[in-house]
Amino acid sequence: MSEYSLFTSESVSEGHPDKIADQISDAVLDAIIAEDKHARVACETLVKTGVAIVAGEITTSAWIDLEELVRKVIVDIGYDSSDVGYDGHTCGIINIIGKQSVDINQGVDRAKPEDQGAGDQGLMFGYASDETEVLMPAPICFSHRLVERQTEARKSGLLPWLRPDAKSQVTCRYENGKVVGIDAVVLSTQHNPEITQADLHEAVMELIIKHTLPAELLHKDTQFHINPTGKFVIGGPVGDCGLTGRKIIVDSYGGMARHGGGAFSGKDPSKVDRSAAYAGRYVAKNIVAAGLAERCEIQVSYAIGVAQPTSISINTFGTGKIGDDRIVQLVREHFDLRPYAITHMLDLLHPMYRPTAAYGHFGRTPVEMTVGNDSFTAFTWERTDKAEALRSDAGL
């Protein structure tokens, strides 16, 4: 990454208002997919003081108790009392969901499933880098870990005065494309009014920041900004309106890679905004894991109603062991990037999506899950099971 000597990424906790909205949208998707794997779901959520509004287009044979589902998500996150300003038990729930347009539906559904067309036009990117063990850029990786730790400290009772809303930001220093230090750390966390700023600063520094970030990357000149505006009691949907799909850079690569603009949460796998972005990560990660490149970015694009991608492009930023054109050939040979094939390849028709809606969709560990009678693996796009075959066919 020689073009930058410093690079900064941010993340937000599950209690951030935009992430509340994402989690509600994905919880709705999960509940529907659990009953109807052929459903078409595009679910959008808005949260603000005293209310959650759920909208979108959904075509399904399933029935879900939307109000109960939305309340459960909000309470699970930690907004369970008027004391914190937003209470999932009592807030208003407004449902304005409609059905998917028949004009869109006729372009997606096909007699043969493998001919399923893309749910929309668009461009999607996937990325991987060898700078961390999960093959993700370090700034976004560290930013996610900070807010994950904030939530862990809050929910475990280690720091019971924490509240759900939090943001993090990490600036990494690079030399010759490798991370050599962390130059700045920002962590803003909502808290109860009785905690002093001095006690908060000490606890956050010792039990969140130093507990999470590699000590060898922190140095005497590292800047630490903990709640830099001071008091942060009012947060969540009281402080800011939250919307589904407004944290697309947090959800992906922290700005290190390009982004096609489409959000993920609330969309079933027929929407290539989501499924093709997951496939792009799967492709890029396997290319880096195979040793074909130190960094890899893939772009794919689609036309609505058309199964085959309209383009597949690769950029290894000069780190490739073989040419980028040859890598594109290998991608076409080893990965079927038609929408139905992606869904099959990554086994996406399971209620696996709510866990993706906080702390990043990428750089996660594949995990076995069971929902009802359905057992499956989540985060399948993080597997590197194609790496050996790619390396062999590349002649490395």
From Swiss-Prot:
Q: Which cofactor does it need?
A: Mg(2+); K(+)
In the UniProt record, does the keyword Transcription regulation occur? Answer: no
Q: Which reaction does it catalyse?
A: L-methionine + ATP + H2O = S-adenosyl-L-methionine + phosphate + diphosphate
> Which domain of life does the UniProt lineage start with?
Bacteria
Q: Extract one GO cellular component term from the record.
A: cytoplasm
Pathway per the UniProt entry: Amino-acid biosynthesis; S-adenosyl-L-methionine biosynthesis; S-adenosyl-L-methionine from L-methionine: step 1/1
Which amino acid positions bind L-methionine, per UniProt? 57, 100, 240, 271
* Annotated spans, Flexible loop: 100-110
**Binding residues annotated for K(+), in chain numbering:** 44
Described function: Catalyzes the formation of S-adenosylmethionine (AdoMet) from methionine and ATP. The overall synthetic reaction is composed of two sequential steps, AdoMet formation and the subsequent tripolyphosphate hydrolysis which occurs prior to release of AdoMet from the enzyme.
By what name is this protein known? S-adenosylmethionine synthase
Per the UniProt record, the source organism is: Azotobacter vinelandii (strain DJ / ATCC BAA-1303)
Q: What is the lineage of its organism?
A: Bacteria, Pseudomonadati, Pseudomonadota, Gammaproteobacteria, Pseudomonadales
